[in-house]
């Protein structure tokens, strides 16, 4: 008689659905927030795609690459044995001074590296929370998003950080160059290039990971950094804005979309133009640029970044990819996901 694992046992591998058999035959009994899983796997998104989006991002990447990979490293006050902690500063899009945390293990050879992106309104994790990666043999850098809770500079004409309202910032200008997330996407990709250029790093073994806004920036980083090796987003934000709106989920992290319409377009006279402009910072429309091997984590009960919005992006990724499905989980802690993500990166490191 075959022995079943205890229901709470840790999965053996990072992937729970490698062969993608017909999901209609999977015996998962659960409430339904969004589409059935087999429909999610075919869903292609609702948000309009700007006609010139590829040219737009080609020009933006060229602008970023002209800034180079130079950075200033300052030893942090927090230090531990066997690794060195740094505050890393560089000049990002539109001249902003961008900050990241960097931890480098003591080693006499080049190392794999990961870049981490935090959730909306937050900041890079404390140095102590990054040490699990250095213990596993990785260099790790963690971005402070401009305008949020960290040390990066926001050059948007305001004193201090604004924390929220970043999706809609620039919409009133009717110019995608003015969208704040255009610059944050570039900051993320530039940090990956800076890490690749560090003498301690093997540039062929660099990955990115993060959850929510961090998942969105992981995808954007991969889309704008062709040399990135691995991409591990967890329930990514900033995908398929129109679908979020149509599901009446423009609340919580997406609340500013509702606020914008109520204040500036209460009759939705410019609805198409607004969603098309948001299309420039919609990950589904740049996902085809991703070359990194990708592992996404999705909770099917996510009512903040709904599964269909995530799959709108996932389904457009053409590189090798997989998704780990959590049927009963939403926008929250996903058991074993962090371990699976590290295992995914260790496979890169050991290749």
Predicted regions and their residues:
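Gly/Ser-rich "nucleophile elbow"/oxyanion-hole loop immediately N-terminal to the catalytic nucleophile
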Residues: 167-212
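Catalytic active-site module of serine/aspartate enzymes centered on a nucleophile-bearing elbow/loop
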Residues: 336-351
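Short beta-strand/loop motif that positions the catalytic acidic residue
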Residues: 290, 296-298
């Amino acid at each position: 008689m075959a022995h079943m694992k205890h229901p709470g046992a840790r999965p053996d591998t990072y992937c729970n659905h490698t062969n993608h058999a017909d999901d209609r035959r999977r015996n998962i009994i659960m409430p339904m927030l969004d589409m059935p899983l087999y429909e999610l796997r075919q869903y292609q998104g609702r948000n309009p795609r700007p006609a010139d989006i590829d040219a737009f991002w080609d020009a933006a990447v060229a602008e970023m690459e002209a800034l180079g990979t130079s950075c200033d490293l300052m030893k942090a006050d927090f230090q531990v044995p066997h690794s060195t902690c740094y505050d890393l500063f560089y000049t990002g899009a539109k001249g902003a001074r961008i900050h990241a945390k960097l931890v480098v293990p003591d080693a006499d050879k080049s190392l794999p590296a990961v870049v981490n992106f935090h959730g909306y309104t937050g900041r890079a994790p404390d140095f102590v929370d990054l040490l699990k990666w250095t213990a596993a043999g990785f260099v790790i850098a963690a971005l402070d998003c401009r305008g949020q809770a960290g040390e990066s500079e926001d050059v948007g004409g305001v004193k201090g950080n604004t924390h929220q309202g970043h999706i809609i910032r620039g919409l009133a200008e009717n110019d995608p160059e003015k969208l704040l997330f255009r610059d944050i996407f570039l900051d993320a990709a530039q940090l990956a290039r800076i890490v690749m250029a560090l003498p301690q790093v093997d540039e062929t073994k660099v990955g990115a990971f993060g959850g929510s806004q961090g998942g969105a920036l992981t995808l954007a980083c991969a889309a704008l950094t062709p040399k990135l090796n691995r991409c591990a987003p967890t329930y990514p934000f900033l995908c398929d804005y129109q679908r979020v709106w149509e599901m009446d989920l423009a609340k919580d992290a997406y609340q500013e979309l509702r606020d914008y319409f109520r204040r500036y377009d209460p009759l939705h006279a410019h609805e198409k133009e607004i969603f098309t402009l948001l299309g420039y910072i919609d990950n589904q429309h740049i996902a085809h640029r991703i070359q990194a091997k990708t592992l996404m984590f999705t909770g099917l009960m996510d009512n903040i970044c709904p599964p269909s919005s995530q799959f709108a992006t996932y389904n457009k990724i053409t590189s090798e990819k997989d998704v780990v499905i959590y049927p009963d989980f939403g926008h929250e802690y996903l058991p074993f996901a962090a371990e699976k993500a590290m295992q995914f990166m260790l496979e890169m490191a050991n290749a």
